[in-house]
């Protein structure tokens, strides 16, 4: 082979090698870029996943705290309600005891309750209903009550005592025909004033 041919072959090989090196270099650079891009993307996705996880964890934490506060408040209200109801039960039992003992204070209160109810009914012929234990009390005060109601209303008022009823104390006063009736029993009064009493009981229990 001549020197010229060797040189041509050598140049061809050199060009081929150069091109091969260039291709390899580009391939390597592209490969490195792909890897770098992949790592960057993976890092971004990782951060996004972590950020999402942190947000979910924070939301869950806030939800748990919120539910705990709500449950705590509900239990506190239930406990308060239980105490208030217990206070009412105790008060009711004490009032019932006072009524059963027929104390002077109770008899005076009974008289006031009958007077108030009679004026509210506003008729001249009234019927008084009380528990059996209070029938004698009413008999002893009926003249005084009649005189008081007559004076307050300006109308001559008479009373009859009806059949005993099942109540703790107090009285029901109604017209003899039953058209108008006022319940001034202990139970009815407690029910009427319950909202106000609840507020007062709560103040004393939880101040």
From Swiss-Prot:
TM region positions: none
Source taxon at top rank: Archaea
Keywords of this entry: ATP synthesis, Cell membrane, Hydrogen ion transport, Ion transport, Membrane, Transport
Disulfide bonds: none
One Gene Ontology molecular-function label: proton-transporting ATPase activity, rotational mechanism
Keyword hit for Transport: yes
Topology of the protein relative to the lipid bilayer: Peripheral membrane protein
Cellular localisation: Cell membrane
Pfam families per the UniProt record, alphabetical: vATP-synt_E (PF01991)
GO cellular component: plasma membrane; proton-transporting two-sector ATPase complex, catalytic domain
GO BP of this protein: proton motive force-driven plasma membrane ATP synthesis
Quaternary structure, from the entry: Has multiple subunits with at least A(3), B(3), C, D, E, F, H, I and proteolipid K(x).
Function text: Component of the A-type ATP synthase that produces ATP from ADP in the presence of a proton gradient across the membrane.
Similarity section: Belongs to the V-ATPase E subunit family.
Entry protein name: A-type ATP synthase subunit E
Organism for this UniProt entry: Methanosphaera stadtmanae (strain ATCC 43021 / DSM 3091 / JCM 11832 / MCB-3)
Native organism taxonomy: Archaea, Methanobacteriati, Methanobacteriota, Methanomada group, Methanobacteria
């Amino acid at each position: 082979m001549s020197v010229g041919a060797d040189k041509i072959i050598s140049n061809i090989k050199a060009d081929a090698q150069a091109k091969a090196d260039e291709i390899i270099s580009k391939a390597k650079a592209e490969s490195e870029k792909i890897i770098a891009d992949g790592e960057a993307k993976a890092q971004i996705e990782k951060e996004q996943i972590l950020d999402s996880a942190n947000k979910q964890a924070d939301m869950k934490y806030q939800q748990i705290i919120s539910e705990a506060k709500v449950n705590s408040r509900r239990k506190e209200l239930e406990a308060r309600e239980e105490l208030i109801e217990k206070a009412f039960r105790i008060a009711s039992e004490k009032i019932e005891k006072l009524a059963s003992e027929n104390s002077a204070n109770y008899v005076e209160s009974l008289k006031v309750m009958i007077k108030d109810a009679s004026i509210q009914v506003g008729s001249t012929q009234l019927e008084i209903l009380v528990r059996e234990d209070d029938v004698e009390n009413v008999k002893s005060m009926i003249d005084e009550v009649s005189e008081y109601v007559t004076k307050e209303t300006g109308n001559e008022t008479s009373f009859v005592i009806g059949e005993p009823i099942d109540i703790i104390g107090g009285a029901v006063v109604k017209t003899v025909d039953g058209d108008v009736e006022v319940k001034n029993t202990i139970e009815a009064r407690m029910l009427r004033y319950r909202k106000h009493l609840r507020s007062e009981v709560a103040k004393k229990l939880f101040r």
